[in-house]
């Protein structure tokens, strides 16, 4: 609580003041502080001590005329003509003023309060707010404040503290800030705290808005004034009660110098968006979007590094950890060569061998079509898949750069393993149905958990940059997710900044994948084998290639990473989807989806007509052979369309066998042409 620093005289107004310069000329009250009040009225400092004699001079004063020409002979005149400017009858009051938010002001004062000033004006924080008591309830008061220089020094911030740097610059014009509610009764002022939060500080000396003009790097002291008057015009003739709070002094700066002050303002000012990470600006929103994905990426990398294999035992993967990972490394050599040397005994590069396997798998499947419950046969297959060594398909780069000896060795390895695959296929579930083939190669993402897609699954697939793409539309329940290549243009610029087309080849091997496993493409390399090619994520991590889970936003700055993951994405896998390893998931023909300069092996999945993918139903259990005429690479033998299969579940094994033989012949013709023209530039045809 403060008593008046300058207690007024007993008489509120006396006409015979000494002709001295006033602390604040009339222009400080009217012209500068409140532009709406008599902007042309400028009174000389000594004019307030000269009483006016008659009504004509009083009218001149009210009209805003300059009064410096008034002679000394008017001093003896009576004051009845200015009776309207005299104060009302004397009232008894004893104003007391308390500073609001004093604790916060003390915190700032202890460090050294700084207030930013700008050309356009900046508000103070903490705002100057006081609570007034002891006023006369009926009398009217004008409340105002001003900011004056605390000393005649200029300061600088050096070695984390403020020190004197020289003499002060010439003082800026003084301006009073009159509270917008003035004049008001004492009862109104005492009802609530009086806030001067709209006061703005500026360093623009030619400011026209009535802001308080200050010099940067100078110390200032705010002052609060109470004037008992019922009209703004009475201010020059009224007694000022002035209150000073030393804890509110500050140094004016154009930018905060002390980091502690900056942090205090961030912690306490709800409008300090410029410093805060969380805000409504685009920059802050971008940070908010990237933070969760970065945290998820770090957690998943750590989890996959520590126990990627332990996740393999989960039959129902969490929606945030999908069983598909996209290869993120552009260098083919460490992954592809290791793949060829380590487990290509299971991966076939021979198209003819693949054709034979397709026929065998087609013959081995039962004609009965139904969805088997998630029971022991599936778990057996899962166990077999886990017991086998990690498998990966050969990449387009290794096929492109490899020599004929590599092909021959792979073919011999494939011949050794063909019989075991055929035996495994004969034991497989009767549920893997043959679905009618299209003339293009649709990308299929099988699901492997309860056969319904909820909104949470779709949210977990929301890729950064791909959420609005047309092939990420909501799916109907109970069906595999089909991404048809005809739905997006597969040109070299199909995905922005792409050129990593071979990453699209990362497809799931549906039912036998674990949370921590990365499934690679089976296109042209083992389509009919029952063991899906996958390798553990921790192996990639050991080579320095982090592999985040598919769920959530990809933290990588490359859009082609997200694009590859989108095209090759797998949802949490349905228990009825063990059919894919036994089906010719990716056909035996040469790579289909292609980007220059990479070859992309993507095959034809066993699917119904794409028009029926949204309808829940059983898989069609017929022949497992895939259509050969869907190669996007121009070949010497034209594509021979095969009649589409019926969608009914009553397809006979004979018809399936006949179609399989026809397709085998077409595949053989196509493969012979591709073998002779392996070096033809890819990607010249587009899907129809």
UniProtKB/Swiss-Prot annotation:
SMART domains: TBOX
Alphabetized UniProt keyword annotations: Coiled coil, DNA-binding, Nucleus, Transcription, Transcription regulation
Region (Disordered): 301-436, 606-688
Subcellular location: Nucleus
Biased composition (Basic and acidic residues): 340-361, 378-403, 412-430, 676-688
Principal location: nucleus
Protein's name according to its UniProt entry: T-box transcription factor TBX2-A
Organism listed in the record: Xenopus laevis (African clawed frog)
Gene this chain is encoded by: tbx2-a
